[in-house]
Amino acid sequence: MLFNEFGNKNNPPVLLLHGMMQDWHSEYEMLKPLEAYYRLIIPAQDGFYDGSGDFTSFADQARQIEEYIHQHYDGKIHGAYGASQGGLMLTELLTRNKVDLGTVIMDGCYVAHQGKLSAKVTAWMFKKYKNTGKFPAFIHIMMTLMGTSLEEMADGLTAGMYMNASDETVDRNFLENYTYRTRPEIAHNQTMVHLWCGSKEPYAIKSHNILKKYLPNFDEEIMEGFGHGEFLMKHTADCCEKIYSTFG
């Protein structure tokens, strides 16, 4: 994992976790205004930065984050924000419960189990895009389920993709993501968790319903009319302001 830090070292430390297949630089550019208030910690997952080995597993990525927070911040930070797969990573960190994350925001979190077949098909579609610049025609079905469109993807999600990921990394990442299951141990974590998503995100809403069965402290906000990643990518200033008001 590659750990990047920005902002005044005297400011409260906040962890920012990027989404699936995303280049960490794109998340930093969107959330850069938060530098005025926090010390930003932005890890790049294995397999998604230049010179990296292949993606391993969410458990291994979580272990590396835990070790970093213990080494540099005595095991405690002010807050953590995760978009899309970043929310899944926060789910894993909360379940392991080895660091104090402060206040947590999951924005468009996907932990709804979709299975190995879906993982293989979706990985194939993204490898085709990565290697040829084109998606297969039935990508539109997946986009509808995500609450977005191919045009919106081109404006945001695909524009921020890390295009140098190996095929092995793509396969492993999708398999880990689509077969992830929320574990009951997360109920032992007393962290306050804010669940955000758009009303056009059926998988995220399904994920909320799973998480709400276990989380002892949470609130939920479903933003009317928004699709996957839309609040962060199209309303970036509002998103930064909302993160700041939530973390304090």
Which ranges hold each PLM region?
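Conserved HGGG/HGGXW glycine-rich cap/lid loop of the alpha/beta-hydrolase fold
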Residues: 4-50
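Active-site loop/oxyanion-hole signature of alpha/beta-hydrolase fold enzymes
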Residues: 41-79
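Gly/Ala-rich beta-loop-alpha elbow adjacent to hydrolase catalytic centers
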Residues: 82-90
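Flexible "cap/lid" loop of the alpha/beta hydrolase fold
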Residues: 95-96, 101-132
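Conserved alpha/beta-hydrolase catalytic His-Asp/Glu region
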Residues: 115-117, 133-187
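Short beta-strand/loop motif that positions the catalytic acidic residue
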Residues: 189, 195-197
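Acidic catalytic loop of the alpha/beta-hydrolase fold
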Residues: 199-204, 229
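Catalytic histidine-centered segment of alpha/beta-hydrolase-like enzymes
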Residues: 226-236
